[in-house]
A protein has these predicted regions:
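Short alpha-helical DNA-recognition segment
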Residues: 29-51
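Tandem amphipathic alpha-helical repeat scaffolds
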Residues: 90-103, 129-144, 168-185, 210-226, ...
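DNA major-groove recognition helix of helix-turn-helix/homeodomain DNA-binding modules
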Residues: 2, 59-76
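Inter-repeat boundary and helix-capping residues of tandem alpha-helical solenoids
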Residues: 18, 85-86, 122-125, 129, ...
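A short, Lys/Arg-rich alpha-helix, primarily the initiator
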Residues: 1-30
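Amphipathic alpha-helical segments of tetratricopeptide repeats
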Residues: 113-120, 153-161, 194-204, 236-247, ...
Length: 448
């Protein structure tokens, strides 16, 4: 699981006290003791009754004494899990989380999946939540977003119990928002990020890193909706918060989004600067996944700035690194970028080959649907330039379908422009004009 703030836990909730009371009563009855017999000379019957009804939370010392009287492990009474069993489960969860942090995605997913059953059976809500969220995040990494969504919905229901703090609930909502965003449910994701941010701010606990990450992801939603002012505001707040906690991962995420916004606004030198800062932050963590992704982006930005040879070298570096770490979809992104360069350089046959290769590597990943659509668009344009109009039309239609799934007006407009160019090539100028008009209207900010 991603690193989160280390904070003191809030006071135990009434519901947790009730669960402890229920365990005490069950263990007392199993031991054949009355409340008076369990209390002995140390406590009153009324005090034991208050504990069993959840009215009083006993101290650690009292829990240990009661457990000794009942002949059970103190951990079993305190949390429902024997101390040795809990330690084994916590150790296994820590190992799975380490695999996730090391970007060993397949191994992390397998490790977390094996722990879901034991965590649920433990009766310890905090261990269940760790297992559910860890498994969900690992599954997102390997493209299993539907399974991830089910786990996060279960985690959300669990976190809404009284055991957890607003901060812990905010984390779950944040991860749920990330999953929804990658499933292209942008409006739903935006609502989840808003709710997560409100909970984090309300928690009164140190959580600058979490707030910064929520803001960075919320900026993606604004970008998808072409509200670049809101996106920029969120990224600026994220950068301010991340500098305060001095967390390279959080800083890298904020600069990553700042670079994308500057790119969309045509500020390519600034976008390159932000991308370089983001890559430096991730390099300090030896996070080769994000280093590969940012190297790809730097390749594209250098091409836009006229540094063609440097751009190609960066994209080849990104491709090699992505393959080395087993990230086929990121390798596909780099090949798609190379195809774009070859198309714009007039090397249409090479662009076709690389666009097809990119689509193979992307493999239909829902979280890469924007890149899939872009590769389909490059493929279509390369075919159009070669005079293979029927094949080009099929590629453009596929790109439009991908962009429909993405829900981005600007991406959809690029597909309509391409189809307009195809119609013009066929001499159907009325249809071309209609498609160009559709694209222009999709990009209008004012409609009346």
């Amino acid at each position: 699981m991603p690193p989160h703030e280390t904070t003191d836990r809030p006071a135990r909730s009434p519901s947790e006290a009730r669960r402890l009371g229920e365990r005490l009563r069950q263990l007392r009855v199993s031991a054949g003791l009355t409340q008076s017999e369990l209390a002995g000379e140390r406590f009153s019957k009324e005090y034991i009754s208050q504990i069993e009804r959840g009215k009083t939370r006993p101290s650690r010392e009292t829990v240990d004494w009661l457990a000794a009287r009942l002949g059970v492990d103190p951990g079993l009474l305190a949390s429902g899990v024997a101390t040795d069993e809990r330690r084994r489960l916590e150790g296994a969860l820590a190992r799975a989380e380490a695999l996730y942090q090391a970007n060993e995605d397949e191994e992390a997913a397998e490790a977390f999946d094996a722990l879901l059953g034991p965590a649920r059976a433990s009766g310890a809500p905090e261990l269940q939540l760790r297992a559910l969220c860890g498994s969900a995040l690992a599954r997102m990494r390997i493209g299993e977003h539907r399974g991830s969504l089910e786990l996060l919905l279960e985690a959300r229901a669990l976190s809404e119990g009284g055991t957890f703090s607003d901060l812990e609930r905010a984390e779950v909502l944040f991860w749920l928002g990330c999953c929804r965003y990658q499933l292209t449910s942008v409006q739903t994701a935006l609502g989840l990020f808003n709710e997560a941010l409100a909970l984090a701010e309300r928690s009164a606990l140190p959580c600058d890193a979490l707030q910064a990450n929520i803001l960075s992801w919320r900026s993606r939603c604004w970008q998808r909706q072409r509200d670049y002012e809101a996106a920029r505001d969120d990224v600026e707040r994220a950068l301010e918060l991340s500098q305060g906690v001095e967390d390279p991962r959080t800083i890298g995420a904020a600069y990553f989004q700042a670079s994308l916004i500057a790119d969309r606004e045509g500020h390519w030198v600034l976008a390159r600067t932000y991308a370089e800062r983001a890559r430096e932050a991730y390099a300090r963590l030896a996070d080769r996944v994000h280093v590969s992704q940012l190297t790809n982006n730097l390749g594209g930005l250098n091409f836009l700035l006229g540094n063609v040879e440097q751009a190609i070298e960066l994209l080849k570096e990104s491709f090699a690194l992505a393959l080395e770490i087993g990230r086929d979809a990121d390798a596909g992104r780099a090949v798609s970028s190379l195809a774009q360069i070859h198309l714009r350089s007039g090397k249409v046959a090479e662009a076709e080959v690389q666009a097809r290769r990119a689509l193979e590597l992307l493999g239909g990943r829902i979280d890469y649907v924007d890149e899939i659509g872009s590769a389909q668009l490059v493929l279509g344009r390369s075919l159009l330039e070669q005079g293979r109009l029927e094949e080009a039309e099929a590629a453009f239609v596929a790109a439009e379908a991908s962009f429909d799934e993405l829900g981005s007006a600007s991406h959809r407009a690029s597909a309509w422009v391409a189809r307009g160019d195809l119609a013009a090539r066929r001499g159907d100028y009325a249809r071309a004009a209609e498609l160009y008009r559709m694209a222009a209207e999709a990009l209008q900010d004012v409609r009346f």
